[in-house]
């Protein structure tokens, strides 16, 4: 006997009771003397059983089913021996679905239903309606009067209610029926019949992915579209029966006083339904009576109780809108108030049940509006925002497990296909299809998508839907989340249920995971395949299948992708990719991917133009296109920069070698591999090789330009914090001043002595002030400095100062010469006596001035003074000299504090430009930079004599010290810190976008979106970015009022 029957181990059972259960069924024996009836048939049964997704589950359910059948189990026994098709269907079903197995055990006499083919639409209607004894409903005379909800408006046309209802006496069609039974009895009948029909569909579907081999015969695979269409038909039939029960409940005696049509939306509307899915509906009625509203509500209640969630949230105004509207009311809403997403939702609508002529009228009136949606002014912004929302609400830990919402998931395909339908369906009626697969096929046939790309996407989409279906069937619950990698048993079950087999090379799970990874990759690249590749192919006239995107269609597509000037974008594409050169061919290969990345930036048009300029600038650099081709991260980062920051784009175009640094090094991004100290030394050393100051400054400018490009790129790519950006910008300025000062001294000595190594008349130190002194410069900051000199031995103070003034003035003039680079303005406004004071003073002169005449504002300015260039020893002595001035041993007097507050009041009242918005002025606005910095400086003046570590010029470092010593509450320190960082990042972002310093945040619109993008936000979230800025600075102003002014009010009298 053992020679005929396979062993338990070979069959793959793991349950300890498996052998006993198989013996009880008469299919197995571990006793050689025991004869199993028809052993060859028993072997076939055993092999078929072991091929299920979970043989133990299937066996356990069969035991329960046989027990439930009692004396009639022999019929099932005989059928399993003689009917291989039944074996495959039953075993596949029981091994894949606990819930449907339980249904079969609860209704054991329905097993012969599995011997029948998948139910037809007409059969499902007959069975569902027959289960509640339905018959055609009759309508009252009042229901024949259409109710024009906007009878006096341009939208009023009423509805023709003279057409017969589509309900049929043979119960095979949708329509308005009346059930014979209601209440719990009806609901039990509906549930049972629905599950039995679902069971037949699932059995046929699962049998199609049953693994066939030498031991097992399978059945032909049921096409995905056939399954989803059958599930949608079942939903139609089920809800038609639910409506019949609702009619009997709401109108128990009389005739129906309304014509109610139910419109299917979403996947049900598109006839691509899942096993378990919400069914979205919209109601239209003529007239809308109180009972019509009750009828719709009862319809939803019964559907939810018996089948699945019935959701009417896609109706006008969503859950806040009325449940039932007239046709006029629907039309009026969509003409006046509907948003873009609502027209996108209407892509999938169709009349489902109820009074079908009214449903058809609904479609005829609203469908044309769908195809005009792409002409709406807000279409592009809305579409891009909807696309970004796909991933937003998915928890990070689930993104790789999500079949629907994760990256490379089902929603990506559905969204992309719908967008192409909206863009091109206005002029091409062949694209006006409901289902995703039909739409993709239409796009392929219409030449909008290449045949190979389209077929690849269809395969990937259907595979993900297959996995989704198998996951849902297990417990007949809504889910689209893959099991975690650690749940090997669940993954093995899913792989087998989906038809994967273990081979010598890989397990079924490994095979499934590999195909899932490949499918996700195909889908994640779909925007290139569906949107950008056809554009490039139309430009370079590549023949891919039947691809024939016309210039007009290409421009439509570009506009939908966010390009404001599609004509210009097409010109750029022609310039880059047209022609037969090797470079053009590589560009044609790269651009679909690059353009997809550009579409996520604030200004795709500007980004594409910048890329064209950069390609021209790098034309002779053979590494450029090769690097973009071989290192994907370089291209992605480059597009983010080019599309978000004109300032950085210009810098990179003038220094293309920076692109080499956009890749990753061994341990970190290449942009971060060079230290600030090395940058400073290289700028100074390179300039020092040239005696001509113009050449030396030009060299320093060139290296500064490259370094600014590097810093700005790292900033835009979120590789640097605000504090790191400011520090690096400050060090670059320090290096340029050092290089410029040395160049002028060399030139002066060569001119006067002929020897650049001779002893100069004086030593010069450059003292950084303001944000330069605190190493907190922004992109648009000037260099606030003071010059101090000390005569060389034998040189008078007057001669030394005169010579130093000549050197410093010459350096300032040379640095300030107009050029294509960001400006190099050296500002002396914080020196003693301000702009009317001497350009250069000796150390003793500074000391005498500050001790005799220094005003409070001048002493306050010294809080941020630090040595940055020139003679280091002289600079250190200057700082030593001012130490007791800016940090008095006994602290500052109340008089000084009052004076500081008086000056701040003047700044608040007088310095803000006319017409400026105080709420969004990043420098002088409420809670912005000036507020925070003055508050920190006042606290420093008041407490520096107590805490030595407050003796530093940095605002952020001082805040850390203030928090460390609990000068004010930590919460308040954090509020001030975040306000300073937020305002500084905003100021930097404005320069990155505008190319110059602007203190005011732009108003809502493209400029604000660009600033938000440069500040690390999604451009589409510009309003949230603005709200965040206002919230942070508003909180900071409250702290400033309390800490700086010592009051709760922002009104000050000083």
UniProtKB/Swiss-Prot annotation:
Its EC number is 2.7.7.89, 2.7.7.42. Belongs to the GlnE family. Its cofactor is Mg(2+). Residues 138-175 are annotated as: Disordered. Involved in the regulation of glutamine synthetase GlnA, a key enzyme in the process to assimilate ammonia. When cellular nitrogen levels are high, the C-terminal adenylyl transferase (AT) inactivates GlnA by covalent transfer of an adenylyl group from ATP to specific tyrosine residue of GlnA, thus reducing its activity. Conversely, when nitrogen levels are low, the N-terminal adenylyl removase (AR) activates GlnA by removing the adenylyl group by phosphorolysis, increasing its activity. The gene is glnE. This is Bifunctional glutamine synthetase adenylyltransferase/adenylyl-removing enzyme. Residues 138-150, 165-175 have a biased composition (Polar residues). GO terms for biological process: regulation of glutamine family amino acid metabolic process. Keywords: ATP-binding, Magnesium, Multifunctional enzyme, Nucleotide-binding, Nucleotidyltransferase, Transferase.
């Amino acid at each position: 006997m053992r020679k005929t029957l396979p062993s338990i181990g070979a069959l793959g059972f793991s349950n300890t009771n498996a052998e006993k259960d198989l013996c009880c069924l008469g299919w197995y024996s571990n006793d050689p003397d025991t004869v199993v009836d028809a052993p060859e048939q028993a072997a076939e049964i055993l092999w078929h059983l072991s091929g299920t997704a979970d043989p133990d589950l299937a066996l356990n359910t069969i035991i329960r089913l046989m027990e439930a059948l009692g004396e009639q189990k022999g019929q099932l026994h005989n059928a399993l021996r003689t009917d291989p098709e039944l074996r495959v269907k039953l075993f596949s079903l029981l091994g894949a679905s606990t819930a449907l197995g339980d249904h079969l055990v609860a209704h054991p006499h329905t097993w012969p239903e599995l011997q029948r083919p998948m139910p037809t639409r007409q059969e499902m209607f007959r069975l569902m309606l027959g289960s509640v004894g339905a018959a055609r409903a009759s309508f009252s005379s009042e229901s024949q009067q259409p109710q024009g909800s906007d009878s006096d408006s341009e939208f009023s046309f009423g509805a023709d209610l003279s057409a017969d209802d589509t309900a049929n006496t043979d119960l095979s069609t949708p329509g308005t029926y009346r059930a014979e039974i209601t209440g719990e009895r009806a609901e039990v009948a509906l549930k049972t019949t629905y599950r039995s029909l679902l069971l037949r569909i699932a059995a046929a579907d699962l049998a199609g992915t049953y693994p066939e081999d030498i031991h097992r015969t399978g059945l032909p695979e049921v096409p995905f579209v056939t399954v989803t269409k059958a599930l949608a038909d079942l939903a139609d039939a089920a809800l038609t029966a639910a409506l019949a029960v609702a009619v009997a409940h709401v109108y128990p005696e009389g005739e129906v006083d309304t014509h109610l049509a139910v419109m299917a939306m979403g996947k049900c509307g598109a006839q691509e339904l899942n096993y378990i899915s919400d069914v979205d509906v919209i109601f239209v009625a003529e007239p809308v009576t109180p009972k019509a509203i009750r009828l719709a509500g009862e319809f939803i209640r019964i559907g939810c109780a018996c089948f699945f969630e019935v959701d009417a949230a896609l109706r006008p105004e969503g859950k806040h809108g009325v449940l039932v509207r007239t046709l006029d009311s629907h039309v009026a809403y969509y003409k006046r108030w509907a948003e873009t997403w609502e027209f996108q939702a209407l892509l999938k609508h169709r009349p489902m049940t109820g009074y079908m002529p009214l449903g058809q009228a609904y479609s005829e009136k609203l469908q044309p509006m769908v195809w005009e949606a792409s002409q709406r002014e807000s279409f592009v912004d809305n579409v891009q925002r909807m696309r970004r929302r796909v991933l937003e609400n998915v928890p990070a830990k689930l993104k790789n497990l999500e079949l629907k919402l994760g990256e490379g998931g089902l929603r990506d395909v559905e969204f992309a296909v719908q967008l192409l339908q909206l863009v091109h369906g206005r002029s091409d009626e062949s694209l006006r299809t409901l289902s995703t697969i039909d739409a993709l096929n239409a796009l392929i046939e219409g030449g909008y998508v290449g045949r190979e790309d389209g077929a690849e996407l269809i395969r990937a989409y259907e595979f993900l839907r297959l996995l989704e279906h198998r996951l849902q069937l297990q417990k007949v619950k809504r889910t689209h989340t893959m099991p975690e990698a650690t749940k090997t048993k669940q993954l093995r079950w899913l792989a087998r249920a989906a038809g994967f087999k273990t081979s010598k090379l890989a397990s079924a799970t490994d095979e499934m995971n590999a195909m899932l990874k490949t499918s996700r990759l195909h889908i994640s690249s779909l925007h290139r395949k569906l949107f950008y590749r056809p554009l490039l192919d139309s430009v370079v006239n590549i023949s891919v299948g039947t691809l024939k995107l016309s210039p007009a269609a290409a421009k439509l597509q570009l506009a939908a992708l966010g390009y404001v000037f599609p004509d210009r974008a097409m010109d750029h594409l022609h310039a880059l990719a047209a022609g037969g050169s090797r470079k053009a061919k590589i560009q044609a290969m790269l651009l679909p991917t690059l353009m997809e990345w550009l579409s996520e930036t604030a200004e795709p048009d500007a980004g594409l133009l910048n890329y064209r300029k950069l390609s021209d600038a790098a034309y002779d650099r053979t590494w450029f296109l090769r690097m973009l081709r071989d290192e994907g991260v370089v291209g992605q980062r480059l597009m983010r920069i080019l599309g978000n920051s004109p300032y950085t784009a210009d810098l990179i175009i003038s220094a293309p070698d920076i692109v080499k640094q956009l890749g990753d090094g061994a341990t970190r991004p290449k942009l971060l591999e060079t230290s600030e100290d090395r940058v400073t030394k290289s700028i100074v050393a390179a300039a020092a090789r040239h005696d001509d100051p113009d050449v030396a400054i030009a060299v320093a400018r060139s290296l500064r330009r490259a370094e600014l490009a590097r810093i700005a790129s790292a900033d835009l790519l979120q590789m640097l914090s605000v504090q790191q950006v400011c520090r690096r910008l400050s060090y670059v300025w320090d290096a340029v001043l050092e290089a410029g000062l040395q160049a002028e001294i060399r030139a002066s000595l060569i001119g006067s002595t002929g020897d650049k190594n001779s002893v100069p008349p004086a030593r010069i130190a450059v003292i950084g002030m303001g944000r330069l002194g605190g190493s907190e410069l922004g992109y648009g900051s000037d260099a606030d400095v003071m010059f101090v000199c000390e005569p060389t031995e034998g040189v008078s103070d007057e001669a030394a100062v005169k010579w130093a003034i000549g050197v410093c003035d010459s350096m300032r003039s040379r640095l300030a010469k107009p050029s294509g680079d960001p400006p190099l303005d050296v500002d002396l406004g914080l020196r003693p006596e301000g702009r009317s004071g001497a350009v250069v003073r000796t150390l003793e002169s500074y000391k005498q001035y500050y001790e005799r005449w220094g005003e409070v504002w001048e002493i306050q300015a010294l809080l941020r003074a630090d040595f940055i260039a020139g003679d280091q020893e002289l600079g250190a002595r200057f700082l030593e000299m001012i130490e007791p001035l800016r940090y008095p041993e006994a602290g500052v007097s109340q008089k000084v504090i009052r004076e500081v507050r008086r000056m701040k009041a003047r700044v608040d009242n007088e310095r803000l430009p006319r017409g400026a918005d105080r709420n969004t002025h990043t420098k002088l606005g409420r809670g912005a930079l000036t507020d925070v910095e003055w508050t920190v400086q006042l606290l420093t003046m008041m407490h520096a004599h107590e805490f030595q570590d407050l003796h530093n010029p940095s605002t952020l470092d001082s805040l850390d010290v203030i928090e460390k010593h609990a000068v004010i509450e930590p919460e308040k320190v954090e509020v001030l810190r975040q306000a300073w960082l937020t305002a500084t990042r905003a100021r930097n972002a404005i320069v990155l976008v505008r190319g110059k310093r602007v203190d005011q945040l732009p108003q809502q619109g493209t400029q604000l979106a660009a600033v938000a993008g440069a500040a690390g936000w999604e451009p589409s979230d510009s309003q949230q970015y603005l709200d965040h800025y206002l919230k942070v600075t508003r909180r900071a102003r409250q702290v400033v009022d309390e800490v700086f002014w010592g009051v709760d009010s922002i009104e000050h009298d000083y």
